[in-house]
């Protein structure tokens, strides 16, 4: 079997003789940016960082911009792939774990931390097999599938919000230092005159529902004294501009905002989605918000995130449906004319902030880095990074047994067996250290 890992060609860092910390993160900015924030802290302390991601994913474009070497695995997500592909999941996972083990043996990380994403699962399991200290950081209140699995094996489970895992350490989600350094809400908002400044954040891809609902709601209010700055993503820019023009609402429509600290400092109120990183920034900046969770988010995790701020009276939650524009109009009618309420929400958000999250995560990583139980690989493993014939026979027998059980089963029964098979694959790996060192069989 061929190696499913691609090693970075980035030149070694001057501190390459020091064992690095390996970050597992990818797929979305919500996983990648917290990892980058922690990488920045570690690098400032003289600790080298290496990254494991997925071929062709967002991290392959973002991470090299920060001079961090990134290795990749040929892997995609397991959710929503249909029954045929689901049936082959155990074999694909086992191959990916072997490939990840190949990378880990080359990099020899002092510790490994998962922020989530496609490559994090195989990378985390390989770390567990090879004895590298494994940590998990879950950004959302509803944990992702990868971090759910890895939390069972991790030394420490860190979270952005309380209540995600039993035995968690709620350290917060990392935010940019310039956002955390903004003045307190009272220093920014008290005594302001002029239009109410509304910041609309659609995320890097934009949010069509916000492009439509915000102009419609503001137009229905009869052109209030409002100044709008709307970040909409490049693909939806023209659509957003047309929507504001048709509603006769003046707005600055921007595909991307480079200086988010300045944008938050300018804003009296924010209308946005409820991704974990965005909410961490709202709290760090200290600004009230109207949150419209992405309805199709996995496990509805954005609603769970939003409920945390709503429970502290730091935000208003509006669900995405056909009546959104009408309900947004009603909420804005109150908030735009009530500066005391906006200040109260901003102060409540600030009390939830954890501006030192990146520093705390780095501290915990380094605490665990000296407590690994790594065992040196056997001579034959060092030579070939291979898998023994006896172990290969066990895996083949297990797969053939499961395949035989699928015949004549209902869809539900097949899915049930598949989940059990996947669990057995993980258990088999954990019971046989060194099995998935990576490479060719």
Curated annotation (Swiss-Prot):
Species assigned in the record: Xanthomonas oryzae pv. oryzae (strain MAFF 311018)
Domain of life per record: Bacteria
Reported function: Cell wall formation. Catalyzes the transfer of a GlcNAc subunit on undecaprenyl-pyrophosphoryl-MurNAc-pentapeptide (lipid intermediate I) to form undecaprenyl-pyrophosphoryl-MurNAc-(pentapeptide)GlcNAc (lipid intermediate II).
UniProt subcellular location: Cell inner membrane
InterPro entries with a match to the protein in the record: GlcNAc_MurG, Glyco_trans_28_C, GlycoTrans_28_N
UniProt keywords, alphabetically: Cell cycle, Cell division, Cell inner membrane, Cell membrane, Cell shape, Cell wall biogenesis/degradation, Glycosyltransferase, Membrane, Peptidoglycan synthesis, Transferase
EC number: 2.4.1.227
Catalysed reactions, as listed in the record: di-trans,octa-cis-undecaprenyl diphospho-N-acetyl-alpha-D-muramoyl-L-alanyl-D-glutamyl-meso-2,6-diaminopimeloyl-D-alanyl-D-alanine + UDP-N-acetyl-alpha-D-glucosamine = di-trans,octa-cis-undecaprenyl diphospho-[N-acetyl-alpha-D-glucosaminyl-(1->4)]-N-acetyl-alpha-D-muramoyl-L-alanyl-D-glutamyl-meso-2,6-diaminopimeloyl-D-alanyl-D-alanine + UDP + H(+)
Record-stated family: Belongs to the glycosyltransferase 28 family. MurG subfamily.
Sites where the protein binds UDP-N-acetyl-alpha-D-glucosamine: 28-30, 140, 176, 204, 257, 302
Name the record gives this protein: UDP-N-acetylglucosamine--N-acetylmuramyl-(pentapeptide) pyrophosphoryl-undecaprenol N-acetylglucosamine transferase
CC terms in the record's Gene Ontology section: plasma membrane
Gene Ontology MF term list: UDP-N-acetyl-D-glucosamine:N-acetylmuramoyl-L-alanyl-D-glutamyl-meso-2,6-diaminopimelyl-D-alanyl-D-alanine-diphosphoundecaprenol 4-beta-N-acetylglucosaminlytransferase activity; undecaprenyldiphospho-muramoylpentapeptide beta-N-acetylglucosaminyltransferase activity
Pfam (any one): Glyco_tran_28_C
Biological process terms in GO annotation: carbohydrate metabolic process; cell division; cell wall organization; lipid glycosylation; peptidoglycan biosynthetic process; regulation of cell shape
Membrane topology: Peripheral membrane protein
Alphabetical list of HAMAP family matching this protein: MurG
Main location: membrane
Pathway(s) the chain acts in: Cell wall biogenesis; peptidoglycan biosynthesis
Gene3D superfamilies: Glycogen Phosphorylase B
């Amino acid at each position: 079997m061929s190696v499913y890992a691609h090693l970075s060609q980035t030149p070694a860092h001057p501190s390459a003789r020091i064992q690095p910390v390996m970050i597992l993160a990818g797929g979305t900015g919500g996983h990648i940016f917290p990892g980058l924030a922690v990488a920045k802290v570690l690098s400032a302390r003289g600790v080298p960082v290496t990254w494991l991601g997925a071929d062709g994913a967002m991290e392959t474009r973002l991470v090299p911009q920060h001079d961090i070497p990134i290795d990749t695995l040929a892997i995609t997500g397991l959710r929503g792939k249909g029954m045929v592909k689901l049936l082959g999941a155990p074999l694909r996972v086992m191959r990916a774990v072997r490939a990840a083990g190949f990378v880990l043996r080359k990099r020899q990380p002092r510790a490994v931390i998962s922020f989530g994403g496609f490559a994090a699962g195989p990378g985390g399991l390989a770390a567990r097999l090879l004895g590298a200290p494994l940590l998990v950081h879950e950004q959302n209140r509803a944990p992702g599938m990868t971090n759910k699995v890895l939390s069972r094996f991790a030394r420490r489970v860190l979270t952005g919000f309380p209540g995600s895992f039993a035995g968690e350490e709620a350290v917060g989600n990392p935010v940019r230092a310039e956002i955390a350094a903004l003045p307190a809400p009272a220093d920014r908002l008290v005594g302001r005159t002029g239009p109410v400044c509304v910041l609309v954040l659609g995320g890097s891809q934009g949010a069509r529902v916000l492009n439509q609902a915000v102009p419609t709601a503001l137009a229905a209010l009869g052109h209030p004294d409002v100044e709008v700055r709307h970040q909409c993503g490049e693909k939806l820019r023209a659509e957003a501009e047309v929507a504001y023009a048709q509603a006769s609402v003046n707005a600055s429509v921007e595909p991307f905002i480079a200086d988010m600290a300045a944008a938050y400092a300018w804003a009296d109120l924010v209308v946005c989605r409820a991704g974990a990183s965005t909410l961490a920034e709202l709290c760090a900046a200290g600004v009230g918000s109207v949150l419209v969770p992405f309805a199709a988010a996995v496990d509805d995790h954005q609603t769970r995130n939003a409920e945390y701020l709503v429970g502290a009276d730091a935000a208003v939650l509006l669900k995405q449906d056909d009546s959104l524009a009408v309900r947004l109009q009603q909420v804005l009618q109150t908030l735009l004319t009530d500066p005391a309420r906006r200040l109260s929400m901003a102060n409540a958000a600030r009390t939830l902030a954890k501006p030192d999250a990146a520093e705390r995560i780095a501290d915990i990583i380094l605490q665990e880095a000296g407590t690994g139980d790594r065992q040196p690989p056997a001579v034959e493993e060092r030579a070939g990074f291979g898998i023994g014939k006896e172990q290969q026979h066990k895996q083949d027998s297990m797969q053939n047994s499961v395949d035989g059980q699928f015949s004549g089963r209902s869809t539900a029964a097949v899915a049930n067996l598949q989940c059990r098979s996947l669990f057995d694959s993980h258990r088999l790996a954990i019971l046989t250290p060194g099995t998935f060192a990576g490479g060719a069989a």
